[in-house]
């Protein structure tokens, strides 16, 4: 077997449609577009969501909600993520250094997910009740 002898399996590739190459091809003259109308023209067609002039669904329905700016700079941290952090004191900078949260994050909340098996001091992070109990059960403490 050589590179110049490789070819795709029979039937796995289709030849492209050759449009506008005579009556006998079945795709001559109008090229499968029919006669006249917007869709027969070059660049013809309607935009996504267009309903022929009827008020489209995306404009009939009301707008609602918003994107919280605070949510963009807040992260949830699992207890199991603490294993990747070196040192006994865990704060926002330690989480950023361990690549657990991004550099834009300003607030983090520790949630009860996974296990913690070493005593750590959590400083300056929000902590859920369940995570609070798990950290203290492992011999750690939480500082505000």
Swiss-Prot record:
Residues 1-53 are annotated as: Disordered. The keyword Lipoprotein does not apply. PROSITE patterns: RIBOSOMAL_L15. Keywords: Ribonucleoprotein, Ribosomal protein, RNA-binding, rRNA-binding. InterPro entries: Ribosomal_uL15, Ribosomal_uL15/eL18, Ribosomal_uL15/eL18_sf, Ribosomal_uL15_bac-type, Ribosomal_uL15_CS. It holds the Pfam family Ribosomal_L27A. GO terms for biological process: translation. GO terms for cellular component: cytosolic large ribosomal subunit. One of its GO terms (molecular function) is structural constituent of ribosome. Part of the 50S ribosomal subunit. NCBIfam families: rplO_bact. Belongs to the universal ribosomal protein uL15 family. This is Large ribosomal subunit protein uL15. The lineage of its organism: Bacteria, Pseudomonadati, Pseudomonadota, Gammaproteobacteria, Enterobacterales. The gene is rplO.
């Amino acid at each position: 077997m050589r590179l110049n002898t490789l070819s795709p399996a029979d039937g796995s590739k289709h030849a492209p449609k050759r449009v506008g190459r005579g009556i006998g091809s079945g795709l001559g003259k109008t090229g499968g577009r029919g006669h006249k109308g917007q869709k027969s023209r070059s660049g013809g067609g309607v935009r996504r969501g267009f309903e022929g002039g009827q008020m489209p669904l995306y404009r009939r329905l009301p707008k609602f909600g918003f994107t919280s700016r605070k949510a963009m700079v807040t992260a949830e941290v699992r207890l199991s993520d603490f294993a990747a952090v070196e040192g006994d004191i865990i704060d926002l900078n330690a989480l950023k250094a361990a690549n657990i949260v991004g550099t834009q994050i300003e607030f983090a909340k520790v949630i009860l997910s996974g296990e913690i098996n070493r005593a750590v001091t959590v400083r300056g992070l929000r902590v859920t009740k369940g995570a609070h109990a798990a950290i203290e059960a492992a011999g750690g403490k939480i500082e505000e």
